[in-house]
Amino acid sequence: MSSTDEHIEKDISSRSNHDDDYANSVQSYAASEGQVDNEDLAATSQLSRHLSNILSNEEGIERLESMARVISHKTKKEMDSFEINDLDFDLRSLLHYLRSRQLEQGIEPGDSGIAFKNLTAVGVDASAAYGPSVEEMFRNIASIPAHLISKFTKKSDVPLRNIIQNCTGVVESGEMLFVVGRPGAGCSTFLKCLSGETSELVDVQGEFSYDGLDQSEMMSKYKGYVIYCPELDFHFPKITVKETIDFALKCKTPRVRIDKMTRKQYVDNIRDMWCTVFGLRHTYATKVGNDFVRGVSGGERKRVSLVEAQAMNASIYSWDNATRGLDASTALEFAQAIRTATNMVNNSAIVAIYQAGENIYELFDKTTVLYNGRQIYFGPADKAVGYFQRMGWVKPNRMTSAEFLTSVTVDFENRTLDIKPGYEDKVPKSSSEFEEYWLNSEDYQELLRTYDDYQSRHPVNETRDRLDVAKKQRLQQGQRENSQYVVNYWTQVYYCMIRGFQRVKGDSTYTKVYLSSFLIKALIIGSMFHKIDDKSQSTTAGAYSRGGMLFYVLLFASVTSLAEIGNSFSSRPVIVKHKSYSMYHLSAESLQEIITEFPTKFVAIVILCLITYWIPFMKYEAGAFFQYILYLLTVQQCTSFIFKFVATMSKSGVDAHAVGGLWVLMLCVYAGFVLPIGEMHHWIRWLHFINPLTYAFESLVSTEFHHREMLCSALVPSGPGYEGISIANQVCDAAGAVKGNLYVSGDSYILHQYHFAYKHAWRNWGVNIVWTFGYIVFNVILSEYLKPVEGGGDLLLYKRGHMPELGTENADARTASREEMMEALNGPNVDLEKVIAEKDVFTWNHLDYTIPYDGATRKLLSDVFGYVKPGKMTALMGESGAGKTTLLNVLAQRINMGVITGDMLVNAKPLPASFNRSCGYVAQADNHMAELSVRESLRFAAELRQQSSVPLEEKYEYVEKIITLLGMQNYAEALVGKTGRGLNVEQRKKLSIGVELVAKPSLLLFLDEPTSGLDSQSAWSIVQFMRALADSGQSILCTIHQPSATLFEQFDRLLLLKKGGKMVYFGDIGPNSETLLKYFERQSGMKCGVSENPAEYILNCIGAGATASVNSDWHDLWLASPECAAARAEVEELHRTLPGRAVNDDPELATRFAASYMTQIKCVLRRTALQFWRSPVYIRAKFFECVACALFVGLSYVGVNHSVGGAIEAFSSIFMLLLIALAMINQLHVFAYDSRELYEVREAASNTFHWSVLLLCHAAVENFWSTLCQFMCFICYYWPAQFSGRASHAGFFFFFYVLIFPLYFVTYGLWILYMSPDVPSASMINSNLFAAMLLFCGILQPREKMPAFWRRLMYNVSPFTYVVQALVTPLVHNKKVVCNPHEYNIMDPPSGKTCGEFLSTYMDNNTGYLVNPTATENCQYCPYTVQDQVVAKYNVKWDHRWRNFGFMWAYICFNIAAMLICYYVVRVKVWSLKSVLNFKKWFNGPRKERHEKDTNIFQTVPGDENKITKK
């Protein structure tokens, strides 16, 4: 038992001894319990009262938490003999009560273990592949026929391999199995195979036995008893911890419960019990959160995942790398929580953990070791080390067992373990030799006997009967016997609905933004169409505007549902995980969305309708108004489920958005407004039958115009010469007009204009109801087939022509030795001692850092001092929140807020101007451009960060040296990629270090948590490289969180902090940590064991461990210690002796950037071009969007005729083309955001290049690709529509649309992104601005009909006004009008006159022509001669085309300027209200930039030139 366990148990004992009252209450309750058992308790629950007795008082909760910590340290074997005194604590009574009452009442727990033999998993051999690029995209397209042929002939050319093979083992109920293996060893595949999650594999072979049942039967009938828990925590971030756990428990509440508890009692009691055990009770009301939503901590989120999994009441749990990203303290708490669960409810746990400390390893009962997919050990955990020691390997002192077992699986040439003398030729060297040794060992034979014994002890029929009973007792009444789900379908829907309302409540910000967007847009639309007509009399002048407003409102209500695609993909990982847990049908989640989303959408539609109906003076009838609401609400629901259906059908968000954009275009074009039904081509007209907007638009328009009599606004003929003419000889110039009638019937108008009829209104609503339910059914059915996101190991992506030879088991080359490192960094034949003696020394003293916090201030660092000498590695340690990273950032001058005071000196002098350029900083997050190769990333850093005087060839030579030193030769041409498809964690960390090394940091190298997330061997490799780097003369300051003993002893010096940024120790570590341990053993009175990790020991001493507690203030102990006095004296001595040493203050290093501006442009432009070229998904999505949408528009308007309607169609088609730009801008935001994040996180802080270079280069390359896309748009739109082929027309359209318009929308899109905090915000701003520009450009509402304010301001400001004018004119210029029959104005001349005589005066003053001048009745007058006259009423003129061209250049220049200025103001400058109001400072001095970190921002305090403050 460890010292921690002893302290916990002593603490429990001492508490019970001094608390007789509580012990008496326990005894009284136990006595009463014996009486209560004999009474009828059908109406009450003994367990409920028993738990309430424990959990209702603070002492009970504290004892339960303490005892849970003791149990979490016990293995299954130790638990069998573990006894708890009833007077000490009543958890024993609780545990015994739970199990005994289950058995007494005939409740079958359903426990099960697992055994497997010769398990082999076959998968696709994907250890390396060619990296993505546009070239590879075309290669894949060209290879499609070959793939189809291979599928047809059933000859697959996909290489296969055994991911794991010949694995055998037994895990009994209540046992924990520790899976050891490096990344790529097959640990994840091993866990998935045992859990039945094998959909990603080609084949699974071997024997499985779940207490006798084979895997097929277990997965088909009892899937809920076996759970695979992925390494990532997928939860709905906006709901609370209590709501998350309650939902899981409700879905798994059994029908038969102990003591006939109600469902609510069961949920409340079990939740309180587990959350008390796992320390989550204080988080009940806190949101779960995620990486982007603030909530509980990462460790608490892991425990939420554990409680949720325990709520499943399963028998076998597989935890895949569950502690990745957690510090060692949190990882220990997590492992202890799993141990507690197995001991309390007798389930089994199979766990894979990286960098497991000895205290974690000791919790496990059994261990298996995997080496390149081969099993090389399975057996008791406490015998694993001995097995490999007998093999011949030597385990160093203080190396943890897990670290030793992992080290054994390293390739022989990189293996650092010693071999026993005489065993050099006996030990296995490769994975196949290890496997052969294992299969021939006595331990393997013992395992086979254990397997056979397990099989004999668990007859199949007995297990089947037992699990059948357990399952029947769990299934809710009415649930199918063979169902995998505990509660029935409608109960699932009900619980999902409750959670849905909780999600809506938790995400109130989204709801507010959603409703606000409807309110703002409604106000804009309402004011834009204000007083279409006078309330007392409608006129034909407002008819078009009335239809345009209805169409725009309908379009807005529908297109907002496009956000359903993003929402669907954000929630998919969570609901797919729940499906794998057998919690509920995915269709139940789909159904609940109908109910939970409806209130918000209903309120939004009501807001929209109230404003857009009454302000524009629509029909003043209550019935018409409520029909207006009904039609809009129905079509919104229908389109919402259309986009949900698109998301369900798609595998990725990129594909879904591309298809969704095409759907939007179809909905717009075939709604009946921009392309009337009568003008649709017969071969494509069927689209309007499946378009819900068609039915909704007809219902809206027909209801609005029904029984409306519109006074004619323009009679033909009229004007001079026709003053006294009779109405019998005139006709209204409006669709549906009847000669001789001053009024136009609304029903007649919509019939001739749109081919609509009022009698279809309610039929259309019924059709949309059918469509809505149809899409609901499609979505519900398809959602049941959603599959989890495909996973897999790290896949290296190589540039074509640089793929390494197949068959290598490891892609890493040997890391350089100390001698090679010294020669590469300092040159050959150098005197290392002299080099170190001449290097600068960095010191800091009396360092404080204070930040504003909640209206007050908080001190994060308090009186910190220390130094870093050349050739030494200094570790910076402390518990989470102690201020390690904060101190590192302060020393590296990467802080831009708060106040810093103290001394930071180089050679006892103020920091030189070259300080920033002389230091390197390796951040914890490995941020690199995914599309670059390792060599290209290093060359890019070298070109821009080394001095400009260094020749390019010399920079590249140095890059090759760094590649060799880091052992990256084998993957130097591999792309960085994303996690899982690209470099693994270790390779990324090496690249991060390499990027800083190629900059040649002559003074200091800062590293923040360089071993975080690595397995033990990878962490050892990184620290060994750092050690070699330090031995060559480099100064290193590194934060590290609870390293293993072997890693810890590589450091020379330690600076230890406690919470509040207070120092606890600074000094040498000493050989075998003797110097450090001597101090802490003296202060604490506790000895550090020989096998104990010194790093964990000192953290437990100061109270930083998972269960440690202290009574002394270690900061005060340190200040009073002689070690502190000696350390301060050392700092003072350095300050006294170092001033005579010269400081390297090269003037070239004093500049902020090493490279010139033009060099920065050249390098960044080249890198950006590579980024685009190697992003085929983005390029493919752009081209698909452009080609598909433009072709759709072109074919919809194919062969536009010479009629009046043809001119309007040309006008409307431009409206459709503008919508394509909206989709491209949204795609642009997502892609450009990654580059912005990379720059701001890493490159800006390291002064790699100026921020404006990023903006201009990205705009240039984005414009190039967008221009190619626009060219395809032109081809697919212009020629199918058969517009004018004259060079002056087609050439101008091409010039403007292909060459000028992309410049506009690219610079506009980047401007919006670069001033926005994130992509969703950018998309929201863009959609509102874009919609406003479309609304005010004159298409939906002609300029003359706009209110004066909008007409004078927004019409002239909207850039789309000039885009539309410029693009429409070449389509209609000089195109003769040939009116269709329904477009003629037909009237009768006065008696005795011909049509020509009657209309001659009118035609002299107006445009148009007369078809039958000699006729004496039914004069057919076409009001236009050429289509220019048709569009002239929209203020579109051919003579304005070059003016519009000039205006667009003005807008482009404005966008570029706005992009630069807004980025500078929003993301570069550090603003405060005081500085903004200080106008004098605006003109007299430069301000500090957010990304700038040069030392002139430090201001000296009068009287002390070395004292610095920073605000």
Curated annotation (Swiss-Prot):
It holds the Pfam family PDR_CDR. GO terms for cellular component: cell periphery; plasma membrane. The modification Phosphoserine is found at S32, S52, S56. Induction: By weak acids like sorbate through the WAR1 transcription activator. Residues 2-508, 570-597, 644-657, 787-1182, 1226-1254, 1313-1318, 1466-1511 are cytoplasmic. One of its GO terms (biological process) is organic acid transport. There is a cross-link at K426 (Glycyl lysine isopeptide (Lys-Gly) (interchain with G-Cter in ubiquitin)). Residues 1-37 are annotated as: Disordered. Residues 144-397, 836-1084 form the ABC transporter domain. PROSITE patterns: ABC_TRANSPORTER_2. InterPro entries: AAA+_ATPase, ABC2_TM, ABC_trans_N, ABC_transporter-like_ATP-bd, ABCG_dom, ABCG_PDR_1, ABCG_PDR_2, P-loop_NTPase. It is a multi-pass membrane protein. The chain crosses the membrane at residues 509-529, 549-569, 598-618, 623-643, 658-678, 766-786, 1183-1203, 1205-1225, 1255-1275, 1292-1312, 1319-1339, 1445-1465. Plasma membrane transporter which mediates resistance to water-soluble, monocarboxylic acids with chain lengths of from C1 to C7 by active extrusion of the preservative anions from the cytosol. Also involved in the export of aromatic and branched-chain organic acids produced in amino acid catabolism. Belongs to the ABC transporter superfamily. ABCG family. PDR (TC 3.A.1.205) subfamily. This is ATP-dependent permease PDR12. It comes from Saccharomyces cerevisiae (strain ATCC 204508 / S288c) (Baker's yeast).
